Amino acid sequence: MAAEPSPARAGAVALAPRVPGATYRLQLHQGFTFDDARRLVPYLDALGVTDLYASPYLRARPGSPHGYDIVDHGALNPEIGTAADHAALCAALEARGMGQILDVVPNHMGISHGQNRWWRDVLENGPGAAYADFFDIDWDPVKRELANRVLLPILADQYGQVLESGELVLTLEGGGFQVRYHDRVLPVSPESATDILAYRLDALAGTLAEGHPDLLEYQSILTGLRNLPARTETAPERVAERTREAEVLRRRLARLLEESEPVRLSVEETVRVLNGKRGDPRSFDLLDRLLDRQVYRLAYWRVAADEVNYRRFFDINELAALRMERPAVFRETHRLILRFVEEGKVTGLRVDHPDGLHDPARYFLALQQARLEQLSAVGGSSPAFEGGPDRERTGVEGTLVASPAGDVPAAAGVWPLYVLAEKVLGRGERMPTRWAIHGTTGYEFLATVGGLFVDPAGARPLTATYRAFTGLRTLYPDVVYASKQLILDVALSSELAVLGRALARLAERHRHSRDFTLRGLIHALREVIACFPLYRTYIDGTETTVELQDRACVEVAVAFAKRRNPATSASIFDFVKNVLLLRDPDSADEPYRQEQRAFVRKFQQVTAPVTAKGLEDTAFYRYNRLVSLNEVGSDPDRFGVSVEEFHQACATRQARWAAGLSATSTHDTKRSEDVRARISVLSELPTAWRSAVGRWHRLNQRHLTVVDGQAAPDRNDEYLLYQTLVGAWPLDPTPEGALAGFADRIQAYLTKATREAKVHTSWVSPNAEYDAAIRTFVARLLEPAPGNRFLLDFAAFHEPIARLGMLGSLAQTLLKICAPGVPDFYQGTELWNLCLVDPDNRGPVDFEARTRILAELSSRLAGEERVALAKDLLTRWRDGHMKLYLIHQALQYRRRRLALFREGEYVPLAVAGSRDEHVCAFARRRDTEAALVVVPRLCARLTEGGRGLPLGDAVWSDTVLALEGHFEATTYRELFTGASVESVPMEGGGRGLRLGALLADFPVALLEPSAGSRS
């Protein structure tokens, strides 16, 4: 069945955005191309997906597994396919009425291997480069030796050692010189090329007769290079002159080298001499002097944290941040993307890491403005953008864009382009209302729906077990604080230093703050950032007031920083707070205000990566109480979500962000939805878990290794390992089955986890002995030997966990499909998916098997009763066909009732009876249409610890779903089994549906009123 026709196609311009019905994320790379995706379109359509959700596919560095290291925003990635391949994929989607959401990367670009011509221009021409303003570079850093230069921390050893080992090689290619370092290629600046060309000039003059045309041309080229505008000249006309003349001289030299053998031999000999001779350190002096004249300063990679002077994506040296707030940068990076939008090939955008942008709100407005201009060009108009006085500047080329009235988020149809933000919301944080988007990528939904299956009663006993087993008593907020401080010290200290110097300049401008020292200000900033409760604020430097949420965030951070630093004067923290909240001193002039606002913008761009690295990539691997909570968008300190809290979140979502994605697994999640569902079961079985981990430690302590006088792995890492095994244990744990490669996966995962934790080993300073101890411990635990008592014990413990995890997975999947929002599926998760963090979750997916299974299910649906099919699938639940069946049936139903699920009212349904706390139920209602959703939760107590299934009256007893006058029908049809369920009178009046009847043969239910049935 084809999806609803796409309104945004070439020749048929839409006035409103296409909002997906359901999305499916595909990871495109050289191993999975446009052609591979095109072949999947019929399967995705049959599954019920309406929109393909594609990872970035613009030209990235060669071999990129993810596409986030784009080197050319104006071209497709040739490893993924040609323009014709891309067009064929888009045509296949269009033929079935499907849309495409493209993941776009505005924050940064890949710069590692010389393919990025913008970055190459910067390395060649410095501040005088045509693209110098495209990147966020501090041309006036603290270290004076780096003035008007870029630190390149790419060397594997100290610079002198690398130079004298002959690893830096000068080459002549065409009319230009380059420096090669293994697979990296760096340009030689035009003015410094004079050192090379002049080195043997006298010898060349002796070879060629005076007045020889080749010699005259050679000397003319030298003169031209010497007279180029300096690379520090940044006036546009001088930049253009330098660029133009340098290219002319390069071509002239290339032609001369090709035509004159004496010139070519002379230059080649110079290159040979400059490259030195290993074993003779002085022979590298000339090359050293040449390198010292370059825009870039080559350095050992370890110095990056302290001295790098270009903004990066987090602490990744190979990803340089873009200045997306500049009109030219926006225009050049979005030309191809917006062309795809205009042609209808792309119907929505997912914006990666908007928290890294200078001003996310203005960026999103610029996207909508660009789409509006496309619509206006063909005579269209969007009601949300019709004229009137209420208009707001985007800051991009001075264009104007109208805003929706009031402080209300945009609903579907308000903004002309469907846009999603990859925004991780902190606990209690609300989306910025000024963002011209339709929602997020769904991490807040992931946290809410996942928490519904965590038993709050397990918090105290699991905390006690964790502390007793590991000996750790540090509270989670303290773990986060220490982790963020560590990141500021070892990964992002250069960013902190830049902020500190900017704040010191600001302090010097006023008599009330000039006595604060640079050291004191850096310390205060470090503490405030470490105490920051959210990823970042969104204070607009063009306004004089700060929104309530931003103000509260700053005030909380400063208050906690004061509390943690009683020996530090409160006045310095108050100064930081006043600067961040735009509270100017009485005598502040306009230059002060401009500098203050520039500082605030920079500060906001630093807190986000510090939080991401400190929280997601450090604290989440240090605090292992219940690791299903250690997930992007989740809070490990929030132990469970009540049914009432879930309903409130869904109601808010329907009112504000009904077009946002509802995700349960993504390419960035630490664990798949099915892994988390299993681990969350431990919250229901704290006593059994405490006994099990104690027993396993005693069985496995003989496999520990002594490293630096301590047992390895330590107790915290061991505790993480056991939870990981609970979550990822194969469905076929036999030596011939999945267990064969399982040990390798767990070894790789635990190595990554312990390095991310940065306690005993790290990526920056790997501890080879500890890493080896981890691998040995895992290998011995999982060795399929007859005498391995641990495996036998673990398998027995895990059997009911797997069954209970299955129930949680099915329940959260149905909730995702039916709750407010757009259900999003990560590739492969329509069957059981027991993957861990990347790269484990980015492996190949067996789509042939999934296509075959879906066809078999469709065939069986046509030939047998639903109830028989449902019972059979439940009996053999381990093969995952049951999950695919649920997804297929629910998505198809959702597509048939799209208006109901997109616009319908969200109605929480009450449950009465002795098992009421084990049910989450709601209805979606629109006019005469309605659908009821019922799922079980916390099923361990219902099933004797997972030994059975929560089906029938024997389990549900007197529990009834109260209809409470919401619905007049007396009979309801259940989608998965086809059963008809009659309502019954309830004590105290009203009618209800018995849970034992709703969940008689299948563990979740999706119902609709039967036509013509009325009470």
Write out the residue ranges for each language-model feature.
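Alpha-helical transmembrane segments and their helix-helix packing motifs
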Residues: 111, 467-471, 500-501
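Aromatic- and acidic-residue-enriched segments that line the glycan-binding/catalytic groove
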Residues: 64-72, 108-138, 369, 430-443, ...
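Carbohydrate-interacting/catalytic domains
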Residues: 1-62, 74, 79, 87, ...
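Conserved short loop/turn motifs at secondary-structure junctions
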Residues: 107, 351-357, 875-876
